[in-house]
């Protein structure tokens, strides 16, 4: 379990836009991918890396 998230690793949960999970692995949590991913990014992947600019990361360029 992520100490900052109430759901189990790899489980299904409803992480809201205000989710504070730092490494949330919830399959339904889109926010956990990256803080720099634009809203609605179809390729958003959990654990992607920000490249500096607020709108660029390793999965949504």
Swiss-Prot record:
UniProt-annotated binding residues for a divalent metal cation 6: 37, 41, 44, 60
Presence of the UniProt keyword Metal-binding in the record: yes
Binding site for a divalent metal cation 4: 33-34, 44, 48
PROSITE patterns given in the database record: METALLOTHIONEIN_VRT
Residue positions binding a divalent metal cation 2: 7, 13, 15, 26
Region annotation Beta: where it falls in the sequence: 1-29
Domain of life, per lineage: Eukaryota
Binding of a divalent metal cation 3, residues: 15, 19, 24, 29
UniProt key word Disulfide bond: no
Amino-acid positions noted as binding a divalent metal cation 7 in the UniProt annotation, renumbered to this chain: 50, 57, 59-60
InterPro entries: Metalthion_dom_sf (IPR017854), Metalthion_dom_sf_vert (IPR023587), Metalthion_vert (IPR000006), Metalthion_vert_metal_BS (IPR018064)
Entry keywords, A to Z: Metal-binding, Metal-thiolate cluster
Pfam families xref list: Metallothio
Segments of this protein annotated with the region Alpha: 30-61
Residues involved in a divalent metal cation 5 binding: 34, 36-37, 50
Subunit structure, as described in the record: Monomer.
Domain topic, free-text comment: Class I metallothioneins contain 2 metal-binding domains: four divalent ions are chelated within cluster A of the alpha domain and are coordinated via cysteinyl thiolate bridges to 11 cysteine ligands. Cluster B, the corresponding region within the beta domain, can ligate three divalent ions to 9 cysteines.
Function: Metallothioneins have a high content of cysteine residues that bind various heavy metals; these proteins are transcriptionally regulated by both heavy metals and glucocorticoids.
PANTHER family: METALLOTHIONEIN (PTHR23299), METALLOTHIONEIN-1G (PTHR23299:SF22)
Protein name in the entry: Metallothionein-1C
Species annotation: Sus scrofa
Name of the gene encoding the protein in the UniProt record: MT1C
């Amino acid at each position: 379990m992520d100490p900052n998230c109430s759901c189990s690793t790899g489980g299904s949960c409803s992480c809201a836009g205000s989710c504070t999970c730092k490494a949330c692995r919830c399959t339904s949590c889109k926010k956990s991918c990256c803080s720099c991913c634009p809203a609605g990014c179809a390729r958003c992947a959990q654990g992607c890396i920000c490249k500096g600019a607020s709108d660029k990361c390793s999965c949504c360029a």
